Amino acid sequence: MSLLTEVETYVLSIVPSGPLKAEIAQRLEDVFAGKNTDLEALMEWLKTRPILSPLTKGILGFVFTLTCPSERGLQRRRFVQNALNGNGDPNNMDRAVKLYRKLKREITFHGAKEIALSYSAGALASCMGLIYNRMGAVTTEVAFGLVCATCEQIADSQHRSHRQMVTTTNPLIRHENRMVLASTTAKAMEQMAGSSEQAAEAMEVASQARQMVQAMRAIGTHPRSSAGLKDDLLENLQAYQKRMGVQMQRFK
């Protein structure tokens, strides 16, 4: 796996799924391939994206700045600086300075990542802030190691939270989660169906599923009533794909 592929993988792991994630992935690919070099336009685009947390925007802004060739005097962006200040916690800043001193002696991506993984996400973000604000300088490889370690820390906590939700025994949460997944799958079906005539059936199935979820939410139903809803939808989707000769997609 190349360095930039690894960076893209880690950064995308902290972006919520949805159309915006696909858009960000495309922007990252373009930047890494040298196709998009207008840093100012990129940062303006990033700043106005909805859904993303300030920290995720800060990390993406840091990656774009590292990768795009920019003029010396180009202004640093406030939204990135604010996101990478470690919540203003002096402890984070102290740890960030210690980490920076270690990273300055490091020259490899993996070495930097290994060192950085022993610090908290707050300290890692603060350290990125130091580098972003030109208070410190490290090699691009080392900076990318720091980025990936930060993303790994964030993705770990997101995974723990997700696992808690998936394994919860609370029937109401499980019920709502099944309906959300069914609704998301229906949306994906509609997007995949496109505008061909054969797509009408898939669109109909997806539309009915979304209406059913809306009705279940409106009238309130028994927590077990949503069981199998997403699986039924997936079966319909896969049958449609087979008929269309489309490569089977994995949503599960």
Swiss-Prot record:
Keyword Membrane part of the UniProt annotation: yes
Subcellular location: Virion membrane; Host nucleus
Transmembrane segments: none
Keywords: Host nucleus, Membrane, RNA-binding, Viral matrix protein, Virion
Entry-linked HAMAP family: INFV_M1
Motif Nuclear localization signal per UniProt: ranges: 101-105
Family, as annotated: Belongs to the influenza viruses Matrix protein M1 family.
Name by which UniProt lists this protein: Matrix protein 1
Quaternary data: Homodimer and homomultimer. Interacts with NEP. Binds ribonucleocapsid by both interacting with genomic RNA and NP protein. May interact with HA and NA. Cannot bind NP without genomic RNA.
SUPFAM superfamilies according to UniProt: Influenza virus matrix protein M1 (SSF48145)
GO molecular function: RNA binding; structural constituent of virion
GO cellular component terms attached to this protein's record: host cell nucleus; membrane; virion membrane
Span list, region RNP-binding: 165-252
Principal subcellular localisation of the protein: virion
Domain of life: Viruses
Span list, region Membrane-binding: 1-164
Membrane topology value: Peripheral membrane protein
One of the GO BP terms on file: viral budding from plasma membrane
One Pfam family per UniProt: Flu_M1_C
Role description: Plays critical roles in virus replication, from virus entry and uncoating to assembly and budding of the virus particle. M1 binding to ribonucleocapsids (RNPs) in nucleus seems to inhibit viral transcription. Interaction of viral NEP with M1-RNP is thought to promote nuclear export of the complex, which is targeted to the virion assembly site at the apical plasma membrane in polarized epithelial cells. Interactions with NA and HA may bring M1, a non-raft-associated protein, into lipid rafts. Forms a continuous shell on the inner side of the lipid bilayer in virion, where it binds the RNP.
Note: Most abundant protein in virion. When expressed alone can form virus-like particles in transfected cells.
